[in-house]
């Protein structure tokens, strides 16, 4: 996989949960000339308390530090339906109780401090099917958290499906963004999945998401906005899809060709 990414012209990637040992991962990434830049961490701060989350979070940070990463991606999974196969992702998202907002914010601040011990920035991922999905929820969380400890991962695909808009969240959170995912959306597949009341997994397997250049989002506007406001971090192109229908290497080339021709050519 690392060789495929390098062959397609990419400079880095995020670590997946199914990667081999940290030693083997680093060896293979280095051999391919790729940087490992981040990994996802599922937190249950509201359900279990921040102190219960810390041991696993430290283990993830240690892993990422070894790999030379600079970001740890976090998403609060209390009540999440993103991984539940028989629940519609479009109308069953969990909602925080009023008193839980501060619990989550304070817990994230604590984890952000820990991340800094390992040379990492904590970036929060707004995500479909979770307590922090919409623009308003994301901006409220950012307002409650310490900007020196908690930053944002901005994801175009989740913003589009969650709010029907990409630029609203980007404009509102630009000063907190330290990591970016560029993911495209096929509107017809999105509406088909909504009508069929599909889960998150079944929606993306049905083709709701795709790589930049293969869907409806015009990435020139968010890209130009990021550059204008001084963003110089990583932008990862991604799209959860059925690999038997959308071969990863083929779609990696589609994404890279689009980025080179449409964004880097500006």
Spell out what each predicted region is.
Residues 3-7, 20-39, 55-69, 109-117, ...:
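Acidic (Asp/Glu)-rich catalytic clusters
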Residues 236-247:
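A short, acidic, flexible beta-alpha connecting loop/helix-capping segment that sits on the rim
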Residues 13, 105-216:
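Acidic/histidine-rich catalytic cores of soluble enzymes
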Residues 15-17, 36-44, 74-76, 124-128, ...:
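A cross-domain feature marking catalytic cores of carbohydrate-active enzymes
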Residues 246-266:
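C-terminal helical cap(s) of enzyme catalytic domains, especially alpha/beta-barrels
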Residues 5, 13, 29, 64, ...:
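Conserved, mostly hydrophobic/aromatic
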Residues 214-228:
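A short, acidic, amphipathic alpha-helical segment used as a generic capping/interface helix at domain edges
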Residues 50-152:
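Active-site acidic/histidine proton-transfer and metal-coordination neighborhood
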């Amino acid at each position: 996989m690392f060789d495929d990414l390098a062959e397609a012209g990419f400079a880095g990637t995020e670590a997946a949960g199914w990667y081999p040992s940290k030693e083997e991962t680093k060896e293979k990434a280095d051999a391919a000339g790729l940087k490992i830049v981040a990994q996802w961490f599922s937190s249950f701060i509201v359900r279990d308390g921040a102190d219960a989350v810390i041991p696993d979070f430290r283990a993830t940070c240690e892993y990422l530090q070894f790999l030379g990463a600079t970001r740890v991606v976090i998403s609060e999974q209390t009540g999440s339906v993103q991984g539940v196969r028989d629940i519609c992702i479009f109308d069953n998202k969990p909602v925080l109780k009023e008193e839980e907002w501060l619990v989550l914010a304070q817990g994230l601040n604590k984890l952000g401090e820990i991340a800094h011990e390992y040379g990492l920035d904590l970036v929060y991922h707004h995500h479909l099917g979770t307590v922090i999905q919409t623009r308003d929820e994301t901006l409220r969380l950012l307002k409650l958290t310490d900007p020196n400890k908690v930053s944002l991962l901005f994801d175009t695909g989740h913003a589009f499906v969650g709010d029907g808009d990409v630029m609203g969240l980007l404009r509102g959170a630009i000063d907190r963004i330290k990591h970016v995912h560029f993911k495209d959306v096929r509107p017809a597949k999105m509406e088909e999945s909504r009508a069929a009341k599909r889960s998150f997994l079944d929606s993306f397997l049905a083709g709701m998401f795709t790589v930049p250049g293969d869907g409806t989002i015009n990435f020139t506007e968010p890209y130009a906005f990021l550059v204008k406001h001084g963003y110089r971090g990583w932008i990862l192109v991604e799209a959860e899809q059925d690999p038997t229908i959308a071969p990863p290497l083929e779609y990696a080339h589609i994404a890279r060709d689009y980025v080179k021709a449409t964004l880097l050519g500006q």
